[in-house]
Amino acid sequence: MSLSVEAKAKIVADFGRGTNDSGSTEVQVALLTAQINHLQGHFSEHKKDHHSRRGLLRMVSQRRKLLDYLKRKDVARYTSLIERLGLRR
């Protein structure tokens, strides 16, 4: 199941640069992180759902690519985003 419209709007408001900024790298990474976290809960109940697991791996790969891009372009925004999302230890 995907995120609700309200959850997406809240993420866009929290991480976006403007009110309708849904395309910035930070927003895309935050949305992917929310979907990944949701799917991790799904897999605790449905261990053999390999079809969804493939989608999860695709999302993780896409998030990694976006984070690599952001790290290349603006390290300060990258570190800020990592801290806000709690992705690195």
Swiss-Prot record:
SMART domains referenced in this protein's UniProt entry, alphabetically: Ribosomal_S15 (SM01387)
HAMAP family (alphabetical): Ribosomal_uS15_B (MF_01343_B)
Top-level lineage group: Bacteria
Keywords: Ribonucleoprotein, Ribosomal protein, RNA-binding, rRNA-binding
SUPFAM superfamilies: S15/NS1 RNA-binding domain
One Pfam match: Ribosomal_S15
Lineage of the species this protein comes from: Bacteria, Pseudomonadati, Pseudomonadota, Gammaproteobacteria, Enterobacterales
One GO BP: translation
Subunit structure: Part of the 30S ribosomal subunit. Forms a bridge to the 50S subunit in the 70S ribosome, contacting the 23S rRNA.
Example GO molecular function: rRNA binding
GO CC field: cytosolic small ribosomal subunit
Function of the molecule: One of the primary rRNA binding proteins, it binds directly to 16S rRNA where it helps nucleate assembly of the platform of the 30S subunit by binding and bridging several RNA helices of the 16S rRNA.
Similarity section: Belongs to the universal ribosomal protein uS15 family.
Coiled-coil spans in chain: none
Protein name: Small ribosomal subunit protein uS15
